[in-house]
UniProtKB/Swiss-Prot annotation:
The active site is at E117. Pathway: Carbohydrate degradation; L-rhamnose degradation; glycerone phosphate from L-rhamnose: step 3/3. This is Rhamnulose-1-phosphate aldolase. One of its GO terms (cellular component) is cytosol. It is an enzyme of class 4 (lyase). GO terms for molecular function: metal ion binding; rhamnulose-1-phosphate aldolase activity.
Length: 274
């Protein structure tokens, strides 16, 4: 019998959650992570599955996700503990044939359940599948320190925030030319914040929750982690710059245009226009 904890997807989740905790982005039970899988990924590990998988209904149907398996972090679980006990802190779930609920196939032992932000994750997966023709498979939410700090001092506007991050580090425009979506402050763990996040995910691979954290989407765990890491590095630079009396020079609009042309990306027009 193959051991599912040695699979690429469990090992990938262990690395991503451990790295995020070491970055200081996921204190206590902060943060959540989901990876969309294929049946072929989990097929070799059926002998590891629960004999009687628990069924949990969704608060709203997700027909586009019908029959789709995911590996997810658990509600109330600490990222720092995933590496110590993957089966207690992670779970593989599979949405049923009509998208009305899901079964917990593996993990989430002792009656644990998936992250409370599962509505936001599933709704965002739904939108990113459409936006990227199925390329994006990962949704990551974390409490990236400097990005959160900037939501207290910058205007919480997509164009403004995006432009500042682009100017904070040259690679940012190349990594997220589609900019950063921003929500108003909302109560977490609700369908409402999930729907608002998913709406922004139609246009952006990064979405900020002011005074709370960030959502990122990408095709792989590495790409998604790297996306957030890049934005957070720029935010860290900006926090230092603002504490040293602000910018005296920066990347100009013309230089941003040249950067986009060099790397074949189309920068968010509203941010470029500022």
């Amino acid at each position: 019998m193959q051991n599912i904890t040695q699979s690429w997807f469990v090992q990938g989740m262990i690395k991503a959650t451990t790295d995020a905790w070491l970055k200081g982005w996921d204190e206590r039970n902060g943060g959540n992570l989901t990876l969309r899988l294929d049946d072929a990924d989990i097929a070799p590990y059926h002998d590891n599955f629960h004999q009687q998988p628990r069924y949990i209904p969704l608060s709203q149907p997700m027909p586009l996700l019908a029959n789709t398996p995911f590996i997810v972090t658990g509600s109330g679980k600490f990222f720092r503990n995933v590496q110590l006990d993957p089966a207690a802190n992670l779970g593989i779930v599979k949405v049923d044939s009509d998208g009305a609920g899901y079964h917990i196939l593996w993990g989430l032992t002792n009656e644990a359940v998936p992250t409370s932000e599962l509505p936001a994750h599933f709704l965002s997966h739904f939108e990113r599948i459409k936006a990227t023709n199925g390329k994006d498979r990962v949704i990551m939410h974390c409490h990236a320190t400097n990005l959160i700090a900037l939501t207290y001092v910058l205007e919480n506007d997509t164009a403004v925030f995006t432009r500042q991050l682009w100017e904070g580090s040259t690679e940012c425009l190349v990594v997220f030319p589609d900019g950063v979506g921003i929500l108003p402050w909302m109560v977490p763990g609700t369908d409402e914040i999930g729907q608002a996040t998913a709406q922004e995910m139609q246009k952006h691979s990064l979405v900020l929750w002011p005074f709370h954290g960030v959502f990122g989407s990408g095709p792989t765990l590495d790409e998604t982690f790297g996306l957030i890491d890049t934005a957070e590095k720029s935010a860290q630079i900006l926090v230092k710059v603002y504490s040293m009396s602000g910018m005296k020079q920066t990347i100009s609009r013309e230089e941003l245009i040249a950067l986009g042309q060099r790397f074949g990306v189309t920068p968010l027009a509203s941010a470029l226009a500022l």
